[in-house]
Curated annotation (Swiss-Prot):
Catalysed transformations (reactions): tRNA(Arg) + L-arginine + ATP = L-arginyl-tRNA(Arg) + AMP + diphosphate
Keyword Mitochondrion belongs to the record: no
EC supergroup of this enzyme: ligase
GO MF annotation, one: arginine-tRNA ligase activity
Assigned keywords, A-Z: Aminoacyl-tRNA synthetase, ATP-binding, Cytoplasm, Ligase, Nucleotide-binding, Protein biosynthesis
Protein name: Arginine--tRNA ligase
Family in the record: Belongs to the class-I aminoacyl-tRNA synthetase family.
Keyword Manganese part of the UniProt annotation: no
Listed SUPFAM superfamilies: Anticodon-binding domain of a subclass of class I aminoacyl-tRNA synthetases, Arginyl-tRNA synthetase (ArgRS), N-terminal 'additional' domain, Nucleotidylyl transferase
Subunit structure: Monomer.
CDD domains: Anticodon_Ia_Arg (cd07956), ArgRS_core (cd00671)
Length: 563
């Protein structure tokens, strides 16, 4: 129980008209620490109690009695709580030194499954920065949900089916060079894809030819299938190399093609339930009662199925396979209408578990304010970007610590971590402009800044040869220490907020605040000097390092011991 929960609990025992949850939402942190650590505004009670808020605040302050508070005073309409810094710091440091990286572990999920649909790049196209967001947000959410007691299933729903394969087959047959593709598969396939899209703008017959080849693919044509399988295999080799660089793993690579033989069953269920309507030769599901104007297009007039049919099949398969408590789709916000339709159709089919499905949208990555597009060849490829980030990180590490032994390994952790952290610190629904120089900077709100704060603490602990004692009597009551203690104590609540909002940026911003608070503490406090507080200061440094490393881990970012 953190201090806000303690205060809410104490207040709820003497306030009849508000429960603990309602009180918790009303608690504030005063801007001026001289007004206390936490404040409760009494305005909301005035109507019920038929008293002035000032009088209510005074009465509540008088009734409060807990060893956790140094004092409780009424200031106008507010009840201001001054916490016992020594007692709380002792409690927090004891918890972290005992639990170490398991500090803030929770069992909210009771080991139920969370399925995370994430990354999902398109086969035969290079892995670009555009795919990064879904990959790193999904990976971070997996760590966050595991931290609070869920098991996670990470699904890479590969874009390995669709008309684009018709386009690619046509392009390869017209202009492809087998040896060139074998030597540099993704580069060559991208050139072919960009070329056919450019030429199709002036030659509509190419579109028709592509549609015909895709129909052949759907009908099991031997040549079409062989080319498709080749494109898929070559792409997966490249993708897996990049996933290894990012240290991201998956539990399933079942992509769009996996559901080819599962869509007829969906159409049959919809038909049996009388949900399919005829519209201009196509089959649709009307969703007007859900406030959705456009019906869900299940089957086109030529008999071809659509994304939603495939996603319905995937949803049914995943529920049956994993019995999920939550199923989340980390997909760009431009797909919001699609996921509203998906949930509504599942509801129409009578599946209550459609409520457990959540679309987790995110904003676009731009370059100099311009939208990126693989089709137009305006793209930032991830592999050379990682190489450049690692190179920039290494230059800075060599300048700061030329004697460092494992420079290449550390530079890789810092370079990759910088790209991930910059993405994850951005509020998910906002986009950001890609700026590698800003990402890899050791100054400002960046991954390297947080990693460097962690490495600095490890250096202090090595110099002191500090090993925390679980029975250690650590406590501090100075202002700089208190700022850090409050943050560490808040870590479990921060994790819960990140999970509730599917928002890793809450963790990233917390990590920045904790690193900044420690750096300020380090600048004002002689941690290693002999003094009665030395062990407690070292315990605080240790606890900060534990929580920083764990916060970075929840973001999928490594924390090097030396930098």
């Amino acid at each position: 129980m953190n201090t806000k929960e303690l205060i809410a609990s104490e207040l709820s025992s003497i306030i009849d008209s508000l429960d603990q949850e309602a009180i918790l939402k009303l608690l504030e942190t005063p801007k001026n620490s001289e007004m206390g650590d936490i404040a409760f505004p009494a305005f909301s009670l005035a109507k019920v109690e038929r008293k002035a808020p000032q009088m209510i605040a005074a009465e509540l302050a008088e009734k409060m009695n807990s060893q956790a508070f140094e004092k409780v005073v009424a200031t106008g309409p507010y009840v201001n709580f001054f916490l016992d810094k020594s007692a709380i710091s002792a409690q927090v440091l004891q918890a972290v030194t005992t639990e170490k990286e398991h500090y803030a572990d929770q069992n909210i999920g009771k080991q139920e499954n969370v399925v995370i649909d994430m990354s999902s790049p398109n086969i035969a196209k290079p892995f670009s920065i555009g795919h990064l967001r879904s990959t790193v947000i999904g990976d971070s959410l997996s760590h966050i949900f595991q931290k609070i007691g869920y098991q996670t299933v990470k699904v890479n729903h590969l874009g390995d089916w669709g008309k684009q394969f018709g386009m690619l087959i046509v392009a390869y047959k017209k202009w492809g060079d087998e040896e060139a593709v074998k030597a540099h598969p993704i580069d060559e396939l991208l050139k072919l894809y960009v070329r056919i899209n450019a030429e199709a703008e002036n030659d509509p017959s190419l579109d028709e030819e592509a549609r015909e080849w895709f129909r052949k693919l759907e009908n099991g044509d031997e040549e079409a299938l062989a080319l498709w399988q080749w494109f898929r295999d070559e792409s997966l080799v490249e993708f897996n190399r990049l996933y290894n660089e990012l240290k991201v793993e998956f539990d399933s690579y079942n992509g769009e093609a996996f559901y080819n033989d599962k869509m007829d069953a969906v159409v049959d269920i919809l038909s049996e339930k009388g949900l399919l309507l005829e519209s201009e030769g196509a089959q649709v599901v009307n969703l007007e009662k859900y406030g959705i104007e456009h019906p869900a297009l299940i089957k086109k007039s030529d008999g071809a199925t659509l994304y939603i049919t495939r996603d319905l099949a995937a949803a049914l398969y995943r529920k049956n396979e994993y019995q999920f408590a939550k199923s989340i789709y980390v997909v760009g916000q431009e797909q919001s209408a699609h996921f509203k339709q998906l949930k509504a159709v599942l509801q129409e089919m009578g599946y209550d578990w459609s409520d457990d499905i959540t679309h987790v949208p995110f904003g676009l990555v731009t370059k100099e304010g311009k939208k990126l597009s693989t089709r137009k060849g305006n793209v930032i490829l991830l592999e050379p970007t990682i190489a450049e980030a690692v190179s920039r990180a290494k230059v800075q590490i060599e300048a700061k610590n030329p004697e460092l032994e494992n420079k290449d390994q550390v530079a890789h952790a810092v370079g990759v971590g910088a790209i991930k952290f910059y993405d994850l610190k951005t509020d998910r629904t906002n986009g950001y402009d890609f700026d590698l120089e800003a990402m890899v900077s050791f100054e400002g709100e960046t991954g390297p800044y947080v990693q460097y704060a962690y490495a600095r603490i490890q250096s202090i602990l090595r110099k002191a040869d500090f090993k925390p004692e679980t029975s250690g009597n650590y406590s501090l009551n100075d202002t700089e220490s208190w700022e850090i203690i409050k943050l560490i104590q808040d870590f479990p609540r921060i994790i819960n907020r990140a999970a509730d909002n599917f928002e890793p940026s809450i963790i990233a911003k917390f990590a920045i605040s904790l690193a900044q608070s420690f750096n300020k503490y380090y600048a004002h406090t002689r941690i290693l000097d002999e003094s009665p507080e030395r062990d407690s200061r070292l315990a605080l440094s240790y606890a900060t390092a534990v929580v920083l490393k764990e916060a970075l881990r929840l973001l999928g970012v490594e924390a090097p011991e030396k930098m």
